[in-house]
């Protein structure tokens, strides 16, 4: 190892710190969105439920990543693994349902916005949802067998895809589009922008932690 190089342990610690910070930020984002929209807004409640599910899924995903990057296999019957395997498809389903509602609003012509911009937004959102689903599923499959190199490569590939999509979604959330609601206030820009940056940073650090994690030999 070259002098001054960051050790695998430090990459792992940085990734876990970023992921736990993202859990707290996701819960805070859900609460802020509900407060800003008002408790009578049904769509805001769905968005808050989405944030809550995302935080819970991330808690379990982070626990599995902590073991995986320490070369500790997770038994197939482990409670955290089973919980993540059971819940993340529900999070993806809720995200897809909310995405479909937005897409219907775009297609209805009720919004006086540029169709190209709406298409780009819908495409980025859908890509983000599918990439996150693949990231969750890839770790679920890889966690019991940290020595499985193809499973590790698949997880790395999806983390590599998810990072730029998280950044793109963050840009979409903070850059106003003419005809698509009013311009966000400074507080909202800060909240959504900070959450997006945390998501990107946590994803990139998780990618590096997996890349540098020890490779146990097959039994």
Briefly describe each language-model feature range:
Residues 13-36, 46-69, 85-142, 153-214:
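Alpha-helical transmembrane segments and immediately adjacent membrane-interfacial amphipathic helices
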């Amino acid at each position: 190892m070259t002098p001054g190089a960051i050790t695998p342990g430090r990459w792992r610690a940085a990734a876990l710190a970023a992921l736990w910070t993202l859990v707290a930020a996701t819960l805070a984002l859900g609460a802020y969105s509900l407060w800003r929209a008002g408790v009578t807004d049904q769509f805001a409640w769905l968005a808050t439920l989405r944030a809550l599910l995302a935080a819970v899924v991330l808690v379990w995903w982070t626990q599995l990543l902590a073991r995986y990057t320490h070369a500790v296999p997770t038994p197939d019957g482990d409670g955290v693994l089973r919980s993540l395997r059971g819940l993340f498809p529900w999070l993806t389903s809720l995200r897809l349902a909310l995405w479909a509602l937005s897409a219907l609003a775009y297609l209805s012509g009720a919004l006086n916005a540029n169709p190209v911009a709406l298409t780009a937004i819908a495409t980025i959102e859908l890509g983000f949802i599918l990439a996150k689903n693949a990231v969750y599923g890839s770790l679920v499959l890889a966690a019991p067998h940290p020595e499985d190199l193809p499973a590790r490569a698949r997880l790395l590939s999806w983390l590599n895809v998810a990072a730029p999509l998280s950044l793109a979604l963050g840009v979409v959330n903070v850059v106003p589009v003419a005809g698509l609601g009013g311009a966000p206030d400074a507080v909202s820009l800060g909240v959504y922008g900070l959450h997006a940056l945390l998501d990107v940073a946590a994803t990139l650090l998780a990618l590096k932690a997996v890349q540098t994690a020890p490779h146990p030999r097959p039994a």
